[in-house]
């Protein structure tokens, strides 16, 4: 009697390439800039029996919760013989877990990681003083209804950093800068270079870094 074949079905986000860029950025933000110092990076040779998993990145969150980004390889492609890569993004709490979208994962991450505007910045902006903080993860606010304070502080910080009113092209260029530098850092690591990811850039968000095909 033939043994019945069992399938494991989970929601995943397909990516167009390999995961070196993602691994490189996580290790840089964990060990160099310390922005993700609490995160745990688990490479494929330490995952254990889950041979289809090429890496796990675990982000501890508030209230004993955590976010896990699990990379898969050797998945069956739609056409051809080449392996397909994908990621699964899961949020865990004490009594519940669920898969989440990359946009919502960004919101969860920003609640614990990467600084944002402090409460006193509104008063400093009104008095015309120098802002002492800024948002390093603006992509996390994409699917939220931004407050007037956040919108005003975002405009003020851009205007003062550029010395003039920013155009829409400049705004898009700034948002893409973090992703471009992540790619450059990945190529440097492949070539054995010791140059690191540039400091002071914004985190571009999970979807951008992973190249998810939504």
UniProtKB/Swiss-Prot annotation:
Domain-level remarks: The BC-like-box motif mediates the interaction with elongin BC complex. The HCCH motif (H-x(5)-C-x(18)-C-x(5)-H) mediates the interaction with CUL5.
Keywords of the record: Host cell membrane, Host cytoplasm, Host membrane, Host-virus interaction, Membrane, Phosphoprotein, Ubl conjugation, Ubl conjugation pathway, Virion
Keyword Phosphoprotein assigned: yes
Pfam families the record matches: Vif
GO cellular component: host cell cytoplasm; host cell plasma membrane; membrane; virion component
Motif (BC-box-like motif) on chain: 147-156
Additional observations: Vif-defective viruses show catastrophic failure in reverse transcription due to APOBEC-induced mutations that initiate a DNA base repair pathway and compromise the structural integrity of the ssDNA. In the absence of Vif, the virion is morphologically abnormal.
The protein, known as: Virion infectivity factor
Top-level taxon of origin: Viruses
Phosphoserine: residues carrying this PTM: 147
Region of interest (Multimerization), residue spans: 154-166
